[in-house]
């Protein structure tokens, strides 16, 4: 402490000016610095926010897959119903066609017997 006081006057002779120390970047970094309570709260809040965002993303992804599955099931059901409808329609049409042919044959047979 005594040595610091014995430096003497600055070269510029301006004693009211503060003496500046050289900038050393390494000296500014404090390793293993203990965080203040505010910094701890801030860090904890940030971690909680990131955790919630990840949870939300996972839930959204899960809901999206569920929605896609439901959509696929609906499409499958619609296709199945459409196919069944066409089969019923085809059977009905086939029966109508057979009936028409039978009537024609009866007509032809009746004409031949005359």
From Swiss-Prot:
Pfam families, per the entry: Cgr1 (PF03879)
Coiled coil: 39-100
GO cellular component: nucleolus
A Gene Ontology BP annotation from the UniProt entry: rRNA processing
Primary location recorded for the protein, binned into one broad class: nucleus
InterPro entries according to UniProt: Cgr1-like
Superkingdom of this protein's organism: Eukaryota
Subcellular localization, as worded in the UniProt entry: Nucleus, Nucleolus
Keyword line: Coiled coil, Nucleus, Ribosome biogenesis, rRNA processing
Family to which the UniProt record says this protein belongs: Belongs to the CGR1 family.
Purpose: Involved in nucleolar integrity and required for processing of the pre-rRNA for the 60S ribosome subunit.
Protein name: rRNA-processing protein CGR1
Organism, scientific name: Candida glabrata (strain ATCC 2001 / BCRC 20586 / JCM 3761 / NBRC 0622 / NRRL Y-65 / CBS 138) (Yeast)
Upper taxonomic lineage: Eukaryota, Fungi, Dikarya, Ascomycota, Saccharomycotina
């Amino acid at each position: 402490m005594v040595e610091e006081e014995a430096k003497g006057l600055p070269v510029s002779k301006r004693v009211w000016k503060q003496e500046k120390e050289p900038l050393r970047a390494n000296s500014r970094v404090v390793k293993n610095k203990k965080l203040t309570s505010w910094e701890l709260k801030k860090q904890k809040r940030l971690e909680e926010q990131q955790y919630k965002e990840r949870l939300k993303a996972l839930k959204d992804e899960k809901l999206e897959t569920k929605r896609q599955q439901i959509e696929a099931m609906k499409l499958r059901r619609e296709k199945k119903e459409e196919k069944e409808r066409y089969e019923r329609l085809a059977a009905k049409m086939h029966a109508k066609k057979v009936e028409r042919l039978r009537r024609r044959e009866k007509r032809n047979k009746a004409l031949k017997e005359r």
